[in-house]
């Protein structure tokens, strides 16, 4: 998917990018490839592949109508090089975006990137989701939490649901169907007072399969969740 194909595909879906937005995506690509030589950010560096498998792929929640350009609080867990939240932020500049990532080098990249792209309303924190999830400044503060290929739902739910306000949504993007994951996560979701409202498979323009799962938070998360760092992965709910 060339940049032009990318812009045209978005336009056909009702998102006519300004020159500034096009420049932001172009500069994002350049910096991603440049920094990737210093720190491991992505295995995908071909321009057409980046525009398809990182940029277009990240925008699925917006293109499908689940995230709109409004001033709400979005948290991205384990965003790595900024996916999916920063492409979403470029498309929806009114969003307030926070990223938590466990690798400080990636946070350094994200700070540099956001300065270069002229993004405002973005915040980057180094640390573990389990620790931030028990911090009152972060717990139950977000309208949406996104996670792209981070962990299976049984684990992911404990890492993300505590950050949501009641009525907020976890939007999880994956490469594979999530049916079995949701079965395995049934107990975790019950314990966390959360409920799946969407589990949908779709295709990228090149035919590659993807999945989007949306979980609603129904009540306040019990205080003991998330458990301390490493436990959710070792002993899933």
Swiss-Prot record:
Main location: cytoplasm
CDD domains linked: AdoMet_MTases
Alphabetically ordered keywords of this record: Cytoplasm, Methyltransferase, rRNA processing, S-adenosyl-L-methionine, Transferase
EC code: 2.1.1.-
Family: Belongs to the methyltransferase superfamily. RNA methyltransferase RsmG family.
Task of the protein: Specifically methylates the N7 position of a guanine in 16S rRNA.
Name listed for the protein in its UniProt record: Ribosomal RNA small subunit methyltransferase G
